[in-house]
C-alpha cells in the first residue's frame, strides 16, 4: 500500500504553468516536483499534478515549499486539494 494511502493528511497540488514566464512550462512543473521530493514525505507525481502525504503540519509545510518553488519558477497558479483521514485531529479555532 502506498504511503500516501496511510497518511494522516494528503495534499494534491496541480501546477498551472505560465507560457509567458521566463522558464518554460516543464521547468515550472519540475521545480514543484523537486521541492516535493526534497520534503522527504511520501509523494507521487503525474504530468502536472503531485501528491504529498504525511502528518498534518508536515504536509502544510511541504505545500508551502512546493507553492513557493512553483511560483518562483514562473507558474501562474497552484491549485491545492487537501484530504484528511477520518481520525485525523482537526484544526482548532
Which role fits each region the language model picked out?
Residues 1-93:
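Charge-rich, low-complexity N-terminal segments
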Amino acid at each position: 500500500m502506498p504511503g500516501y494511502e496511510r497518511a494522516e493528511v494528503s495534499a494534491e497540488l496541480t501546477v498551472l504553468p505560465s507560457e509567458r514566464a521566463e522558464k518554460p512550462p516543464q521547468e515550472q512543473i519540475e521545480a514543484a516536483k523537486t521541492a516535493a521530493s526534497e520534503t522527504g514525505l511520501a509523494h507521487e507525481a503525474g504530468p502536472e499534478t503531485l501528491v504529498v502525504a504525511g502528518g498534518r503540519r508536515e504536509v502544510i509545510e511541504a505545500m508551502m515549499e512546493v507553492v513557493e518553488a512553483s511560483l518562483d519558477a514562473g507558474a501562474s497558479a497552484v491549485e491545492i486539494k487537501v484530504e484528511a483521514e477520518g481520525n485525523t485531529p482537526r484544526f482548532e479555532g
